[in-house]
C-alpha cells in the first residue's frame, strides 16, 4: 500500500508563502519554484498534478497571486479536483464535500 504524499508548488507570486509553509511543514515535497524570479505558473501546476495523479492518496498545494490561474491550469487534468480557498473553513469544505485533491491558495 502506497503512502500519502503531499506536494507543493508555486509561481513567483506565491514563493514567499510557500517558503513559510515549508518551514512549518518540512515533510511536504517542494516542486518549485525555487526563487521569486518570474516563471510561468502552468509549468508548476503541471508538475504538481502529475505527482498527485500517481497515487489516489496524494494531495497537493498550489500557490499563485490570485489562485485563479493555478486553479484553471490544475483542473484541466482529468482526475484533479483543485479548489481555491482563502480561509481554513473553505479549505476544509472543499476537501470534505468536494473531495478536492489540490488546495489552491492566493
Positions of PLM-derived features:
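Solvent-exposed alpha-helices and their adjacent loops that cap or buttress functional pockets
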Residues: 1, 53-55, 95-97
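Structural motif
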Residues: 38-47
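Extreme N-terminal starter segment of soluble prokaryotic enzymes
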Residues: 2-6
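Helix-adjacent hinge/juxtasegments
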Residues: 48-84
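Short hydrophobic/aromatic-enriched beta-strand-loop microsegments
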Residues: 28-30, 80-87
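C-terminal binding/interaction regions
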Residues: 7-16, 20, 88-106
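A short beta-strand-loop structural module common to alpha/beta enzyme folds
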Residues: 27-39
Amino acid at each position: 500500500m502506497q503512502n500519502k504524499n503531499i506536494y507543493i508548488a508555486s509561481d513567483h507570486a506565491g514563493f514567499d508563502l510557500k517558503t513559510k509553509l515549508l518551514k512549518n511543514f518540512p515533510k511536504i515535497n517542494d516542486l518549485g519554484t525555487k526563487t521569486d524570479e518570474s516563471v510561468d505558473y502552468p509549468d508548476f501546476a503541471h508538475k504538481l498534478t502529475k505527482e498527485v495523479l500517481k497515487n489516489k492518496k496524494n494531495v497537493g498545494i498550489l500557490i499563485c497571486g490570485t489562485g485563479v490561474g493555478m486553479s484553471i491550469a490544475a483542473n484541466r487534468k482529468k482526475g484533479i479536483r483543485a479548489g481555491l480557498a482563502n480561509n481554513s473553513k473553505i479549505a476544509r469544505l472543499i476537501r470534505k464535500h468536494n473531495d478536492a485533491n489540490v488546495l489552491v491558495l492566493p
